[in-house]
Amino acid sequence: MASNSPMRRIWILVVTLWLAAGVSCEKRHNKQIDPELASLGSAEITGQIVEIPGEFPANDFYNYAYVLKYRVLKVHRGQVNGSEIFVAHYNPLKPRATVADEFSGKVGGKVERFRAGEIHRMALEEPLDKFWMGGIIDKYFENKGTRYWAVWTNPGEP
């Protein structure tokens, strides 16, 4: 085949499309659920952070849990009370992959930092005070309702 022949161009186009389709399908099928999400907690949800009420304090002197408000987008297992819930995250300035310590119990995930509007897939436990007895910053204290403990937090999709 000549280097610029129509057959060669068609052959290259077919191979390129075939490879692109294979890569596209691989990405779709590679979305496996994190086994920690599927096994930890009594509920698993996808939720969007409604707001972060203030800045997170530094972890210089003590460990704490910070309560964030989430809009529930989907409940994957278990149940939660309402379409908006309050979720406490342990030491939210630390990436979830390195946050666990001798005080927290098993917590973790793949979220690097928390920003309003982000979507997270989380394994949750309730009530908060059954899983965390340390400092709690809850700027929603006037709002009644369950406070959930975020056991595992990964980035999520709508």
Regions found by a protein language model. Name each.
Residues 2-11:
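Bacterial N-terminal signal peptides that target proteins for export
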Residues 64-158:
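Disulfide-stabilized netrin-like
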Residues 21-24:
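C-terminal motif of bacterial Sec signal peptides marking the signal peptidase cleavage site
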Residues 26-28:
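Bacterial signal peptide processing site
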